[in-house]
């Protein structure tokens, strides 16, 4: 996702058999007490729209309350410069992984029964070698960053948004998956609960070959992945798209791809592993790729029927009708809508 730039895959391979760790795909299922937000698993269906960390004019807790979205995906974490092994929110050195950076807002969201899903990468990081796995060549150092995020904010899941140049960085892909496996082993040893998800670009037919290779490497490295989240927008195919049909066919394609990677998994497990991220209104391509208010209702019902585990969208700050006809706006959807329309529709999916 532009400057945007978002228990499966992570299956453990034993011999020639990949065993899928889904559902409670957690490292350390006995983790914690009920008083620790990290000890609470994510609900069976999660709605977690992206919050743009570079636009904090309205705080996390406030937008969560206004929109009704109990879970937020936080975009993004990245290094300040290539070669660094230190991650910051939006790559801003004044915003380290520390309680002083958004800790109070996250605690408020957790006290209300929700949580946040921090996301690494995104389009900007992935095109500037500042995604942590592209920037840092030490797998233990990458894992330590993941562990710090878990212990600092008590999060239930970490998302890894891999796009653009990062999809071709095979060394970075392998480091990332090794670091996931290392973090999961650390979590199990410390009786902590954690999940990892991948957010990947898609065609209407499913993952690109590069996206599929990311998951194949996860299996090889023994990394457990709880969700694969498809970016079902910005196709740039040059034709008018049926965004509902494209979402459904992309998910069908991913299902087939996952089944080939994880033949031991049930259909229900595979569908529950699939996540969908829409871009409400007019996306970056333009009016030919418009996700309408009616589309949102259709997708929410379809996702419930299919057993989809996650719905998200880009991004919470856009969930208003302030700029009808504008494509790819960062603060409004480009279509006429009531404030928080898409959030309310997709929150019903989660409930």
Task: Indicate residue ranges for each PLM-predicted region.
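Residues that scaffold, gate, or flank divalent-cation-dependent active/transport sites
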Residues: 315
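Generic detector of short, well-ordered, non-transmembrane alpha-helical segments enriched
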Residues: 25-27, 68, 224, 307
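Short, low-complexity, polybasic intrinsically disordered segments
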Residues: 289-310
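Secretory targeting and sorting signals
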Residues: 1-31
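Beta-sheet entry/capping signal
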Residues: 115, 310-311
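A structural signal for short secondary-structure junctions
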Residues: 268-270, 305-306
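Chitinase-like catalytic core of GlcNAc-active glycosidases
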Residues: 34-230, 234-261, 269-275, 281-296, ...
